[in-house]
Amino acid sequence: MNRLARKIAWRYLFSKKSHSAINAISIVSVCGVAITTLALVCTLSVYNGFTELIGSLYSQIDPQIKITPLQGKTLDTEEEAIEQIAEWNEVKTFTPVIEENALCIYKDRQRPVLVKGVPDNYTELSHIQDIVTSGTFQLNDGRIDYVSLGIGVAGQLGVVANSPYPVELYAPNRLGKVNLANPSQSFNGRRIFVSSTFCANQAIYDDQLAIIPLSTAREMFSYTTEATAIELRLTPTTNENEFAKKLSCLLYTSDAA
């Protein structure tokens, strides 16, 4: 039956009587379907490409799991539940971070930034070195602390990686009172050299982020063992959904206690 149908379709489509209305309608219909199908394939290919691009960008700088406090602003990394998470076999990289707003100044230019203090194992969590556009991602060489700036921040400040001049970071003294007689004492400041710039093609990072060592961030913002978030990377064999359920159960039990 299918063979007969194909023969009939072939005869009407390629009949020598090309002036036939049936032939004309058939050709127009076939062309219309072909063009529509081709356009759909191209569109899906483009969307698939965008999905892969966005996914790869997020995987370069975002953690798989991010733990933030339900109440308040910080978590204590020495709390029993937090220390327990760090020991789980499913956790490949355990990274406490501090994220706070600050003012960044370079020569006669300044702009607000989101300072992110990270420990030495941050490259194992984020692979940020893969999106570095200039310099080398390095936060400490054993003697000097460094900052890595989003490419938008660096551009607006007019600073480049490995500049001989440091940027200055200022944040309000979180624990002290405002000194009206000498307002400068109400701020904590750090002079720090730029080791690299990075581009994630996401404004939330490129135009705001300044990454510094966790120890320096804790000094600037008057923290000791606290972190504003815990970022995790899981082992390749770990089911992310199952891990999230396990994590929620632990944290809920801890909060209830």
Model-assigned labels for residue ranges:
Residues 1-37:
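N-terminal Sec/SRP start-transfer signal
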Residues 6, 21-24, 125, 240, ...:
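A general structural signal for well-ordered alpha-helical segments in protein cores
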Residues 35-46:
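Hydrophobic alpha-helical membrane-associated segments
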Residues 44-114, 120-143:
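Hydrophobic, regular-secondary-structure patches
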Residues 61-63, 90, 109-113, 145, ...:
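Envelope-exposed proteins and targeting segments
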Residues 101-193, 219-221:
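Short acidic/glycine-enriched loop/turn elements at secondary-structure junctions
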Residues 171-177, 181-254:
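Mechanotransmission and gating elements of multispan inner-membrane complexes involved in transport
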